[in-house]
Amino acid sequence: MRELLTRASSFMSLLPADEQAVPEPSPNSFFYRVFYKHIDIANKVVDTSYLQTMAAGKLCPDYYGQLTVLDSYYCYRAADTLKSLLCKIDQEDNPKLYKLANVMSQKYDKYNSTFLDYWHLRESDSVTPTKTMHDYAEHEHNVMCYEDPIYTLVAYIPCYYLWPWFSQQIMERDGYNKDGIYDYWFKGNYYGKDSYKSAWLIGDLIEEWEAIEKTFDEAKAEEIYVKSMNYELQVFTEADKKEGGQ
C-alpha cells in the first residue's frame, strides 16, 4: 500500500532533519496575541459540520476527496506566490526571511509534484476552484504584491498553525473516533508539539523582525491574519455543502 499523501507529510514541516530545536514564540508575541484575540474564529472552524462529521468517522468520502482536490489549487497558488516573494527579498539583508520563504516554496513544490499523479489529474489547471478558495489564494498573492515581504508570512500563519491546532482540539474531545477512517488525517496534522514548530518558525521570525526593523505595522498584520483565518473558516464551512456528497 502506498504512503498516504497528506499536507503534513509534504509541506507543513519546514524543518530539516538536523534542525529540530525551535523556540515557541513568547506569550506576548504577535503570534499568540492575535491568535487568542480571534480564537472565536478558530473555534468556529472546529465546530464546522465537515470536521465534526470527519471526527466521528462518518464524513462522506466524496466531500473528503472534493476538498482535498480543491485544496490543491491553494497549494499550487501558494508555491507561485512564494516564488514571487523570493524576488522581493534582499537575501543579504534578510537571510532568515529568504531562507524560510524558500523552504516554504520548496515544500509546496514537493507536495504539488506528487499530487497530480496521486489523484490521477493531468495538470494543475484541471482543478476548478470555488470562489472562496480562489479569493483566499488571491488574498495571499495580493499581500505579496503590495506589502513588505514579512506580511506575506503573516498571511500564511493560519495555514500552518490552525490545522494542527484544530486537529488537537478535535482529537482531545469526547466523541472522537480513533478507529475512524479519518484518524490518519488528524494524526497527520497533530502529532504533539512538533506539529507546531513550522508555525513557530514563522512566529519567531516575525517577532525578531518586529524588534529589529521597527516598521512592523501590527494593525495591518492583524487585518491580513484575520482575513486568512476567515477564509479558512469559509473553506471548511462550505466543504460539505457541495452537491455530490451524501
Residue positions per predicted region:
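Hydrophobic alpha-helical segments
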Residues: 15-30, 139-140, 149, 234-237, ...
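Short alpha-helical hairpin
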Residues: 14-18, 33-59, 78, 203-211
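Active-site-proximal alpha-helical scaffolds that flank and shape metal-associated catalytic sites
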Residues: 25, 69, 93-197, 226, ...
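Structural helix-adjacent loops and short alpha-helical linkers that scaffold large soluble proteins
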Residues: 89-94, 214-219
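Acidic, carboxylate-rich catalytic segments that either coordinate divalent cations
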Residues: 219-246
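Serine/threonine-rich intrinsically disordered cytosolic regulatory regions enriched
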Residues: 4, 9-10
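K/E-rich alpha-helical interaction surfaces of small helical-bundle regulatory domains
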Residues: 66-76, 106, 230-234, 241
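Alpha-helical bundle segments that constitute or directly flank the non-heme di-iron/ferroxidase center
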Residues: 39-44, 58-88, 151-164
